[in-house]
Amino acid sequence: MSENTYQIETRRRSRSKTPFLRSSCDHENCEHAGEEGHVHHLKRKSAAPNVQTIIEEHIVESSISKKTRAKAFAQLTSDYSSDDMTPDAKRKQNSITATVTSILTKRSGGATSTPRNRSQLETTQNTLNSAQEKLNQSNGNLSSGNVSDYLAYIEYRDAGEYWNKTPKTDYTYSELSPHRRQLAPGIVAMPNMSRKSLENHNDRVNYMVQQNPAQEEFIRRRYQSKYTQQVNYDSADELDATFGQQKQSWWLIRLIQLVVSSITTVWSRVTNLSATETTAYQNYHAKRQQSQQVGLWWKIVQTIGGGLASLLRYLYVFIGSVLSLDTWLLRSSDAENKSKKRFLIFLLILLPLLLLSGWLLLQEDQRSAYVQRAEALLPLPLSIFGSLRSRFSNAGATLKSWMEVPTVRSPQREAEAIKVNMASIEQNIQKALTAEEYENILNHVNSYVQQLVELKMQQHSKELAPQQIELFVKLMKENLKQIMYKTELSEKDLSDLAIKLKLELQSSGGWQDGAKLSQANLEEITKLIKAEVHLHESHYTIQLDRIDFASLLERILAAPALADFVDARISLRVGELEPKESSGSSDAEVQIERLNREIAFIKLALSDKQAENADLHQSISNLKLGQEDLLERIQQHELSQDRRFHGLLAEIENKLSALNDSQFALLNKQIKLSLVEILGFKQSTAGGSAGQLDDFDLQTWVRSMFVAKDYLEQQLLELNKRTNNNIRDEIERSSILLMSDISQRLKREILLVVEAKHNESTKALKGHIREEEVRQIVKTVLAIYDADKTGLVDFALESAGGQILSTRCTESYQTKSAQISVFGIPLWYPTNTPRVAISPNVQPGECWAFQGFPGFLVLKLNSLVYVTGFTLEHIPKSLSPTGRIESAPRNFTVWGLEQEKDQEPVLFGDYQFEDNGASLQYFAVQNLDIKRPYEIVELRIETNHGHPTYTCLYRFRVHGKPPAT
């Protein structure tokens, strides 16, 4: 039986990125696979706690001995027949094998940081290796290819129903799988695989059918050997799906690049606008001087060439943009994209209509401003039109200035232009300011202009001195001489002009060397010269009429000689007026007017200040009203608090007084009963109604039974007088004994009653907690809640220095709900990282969601700690929309690691989070043999409370004590 037993090792989880370590000996790296007696070291796999031991037995009867069975070992258990078997094998086919398969679940130390659950199938590859050697020895004439095929056939034939016996690594429901996690009866969770399942196989097949296999690039990528070697674990369908995803995502990259390039282009244009204007201003005078030196024809050619070059450049950019847009719209011919293309074409048609309607709604000044801005920013037909318009307008103005006689604008037209300009400026100011601000500015301007006009009138009313007039005439003569000097031509200038004229005539072909001027020609030249001189004289006359006397007067007044002269005249006049003490009415009127102006200005300022003060007073009054309301509320609150406090004190005093009265009333009653019992009043009363007698009856009975002291002394004195000394001594002795006995009995009874009442009152007081104690308890509970709800230090808190080292092969769960999307295209999916599990925020949805089991979380604490316990927190059921917390962790374990890839971790404990318990549950360390501190802790979540898709981890705390320094 043991000879026929073979082991099939559980396959490893394919393509996992988990940093697991290989065993020192496995099937792929074993160098002694063919040796006899060599046993492979099985890899230790994780198994769920609910995996049960399953034993399957397949027994086939046989009549052959063990020797025959050993010889025919190549043929193991099989119910199948084959025609490819050799005759020797057919003769030795009748054999018996019994396969016993068992799964042993055992927790032990492993070679990696994975769980110590081990799945062992009692079938091994050594049997197949030995069978291969025996088959090679018996069938030496077979080729190596046939042997390998035969062994593959034997392996599949002997495995039987391997799909039910061998654990799978993909989406599986096999009860033998070590990765099986049963969340609830009938609900099995998908294992945590890095490769997706075959659930999208039909979609990939449909995609393959739609592709054209005749495409050269598709075939080359599909069957290229070098590309296939890079992805050894990918199937052909997965490659097809990858190519499809790449093909579908390229247009998204194009869109992102287009948006980024547009933003950068606009930003560069805006930032370079000022630099361009500065360069234009700097090059303006240089270009103008150069244009003055260049001839007429060269200017015309240069203007036409520049315009054509700009037109061709912008035309090229426009054609390229249109072609790119057409390519983007017509890039695909799928039927699914027709609606999308129609919508995009509709948007492209709608955009110019919207721009045109917005342009018609704008005003003229706004249109001009937008045109200038667009000409500076956009390299589009609008910019082309603007640049061409400016170039043609400049060229036309230049030609007009060359060809036409310069004209002078009339003063009326200039005045009209100035009025139009002032009206536009006034309209813009009214739009930019409010009515009140505009009126204030007008008032200030009017007052300022009025002051200037009055000052000018005063200055014009004064007569100029002869020296000032002479100075004005001198300056005007100098200016006129300079103007005349500029208009006069010297002999050198005339000769140069004649030479230039001769050269121009020679170049034009109209010059003849032997030609002479006739009398008619001379007369015509004389007329032209006179007309030109007359034209220049009229021009200079007009120029003299157009002299700005205000600027000329300003220059004259700014001359230093005039300032010295005026100062001298003023000092002389002041010296003459000092002896005189006459104050005429004119000076008083001037001062009164000046004071009136100052008063008007002060009134305007005071009105502004008064308006500001009114607003300030209004705000202060509002603040006072709010303050009075707040004070009234505070007083009402204080009164209510005082009333509540006084009522509470009165209630406490009433309770204390009632308690004291009840205690003393009971004590008095008990003392009264004791006295009645001692003195014998109960026996003397009929019917035993002593308990119902009042104090008056008791006092009457005592007086009747006993004698007062004074009366007794009087009687005793009389008796002593009548009796001898012996009788008196006997009476005194008897009274002393009687009183001592009575006092002792009274003391004992009173002490017993007082002690009993004290015990009863103590028990009663123990049942009633004082208000101060209640407040102290509430303060203690609130202090614990404020201290992170636990009152313990969390050494895994991220803000305190904790960090996430790894999640191993755990796959995070994504909701696929796009946070940012453009035209329905998702650009960014928000996900919560594992760092949320060590952050203090616990709100619904603020958790780390992962799929599959087990879920790993490796934490690094902020320091070395003697770990004492853990706290796992989840949202309560009251905050869940469904009223359930199925995604909460259930079974989990905590391990201590010396390093991230520790091969021998230490188990702190195996715990279970109760969904019916509190939302915050504390778990103490179960392994009390741990005597060393740890800095790295690993959390492994095995199951949850029934959610089949994902598990949520809200907050995990690690508590402990730091080592003593």
From Swiss-Prot:
Superkingdom per UniProt: Eukaryota
Pfam families listed in its UniProt record: Sad1_UNC
Boundaries of every SUN domain copy: 801-963
PROSITE patterns with a match to the protein in the record: SUN (PS51469)
Coiled coil: 585-612
Compartment annotation: Membrane; Cytoplasm, Cytoskeleton, Microtubule organizing center; Cytoplasm, Perinuclear region
Disordered: annotated segments: 1-20
Primary site of residence: membrane
Alphabetized PANTHER family for the sequence: KLAROID PROTEIN-RELATED, SAD1/UNC-84-LIKE PROTEIN-RELATED
Subunit record text: Core component of the LINC complex which is composed of inner nuclear membrane SUN domain-containing proteins coupled to outer nuclear membrane KASH domain-containing nesprins.
Physiological role: Component of the LINC (LInker of Nucleoskeleton and Cytoskeleton) complex involved in the connection between the nuclear lamina and the cytoskeleton. Is required to nuclear migration in eye and to anchor klar in the nuclear membrane.
Protein name per UniProt: Klaroid protein
Species per Swiss-Prot/TrEMBL record: Drosophila melanogaster
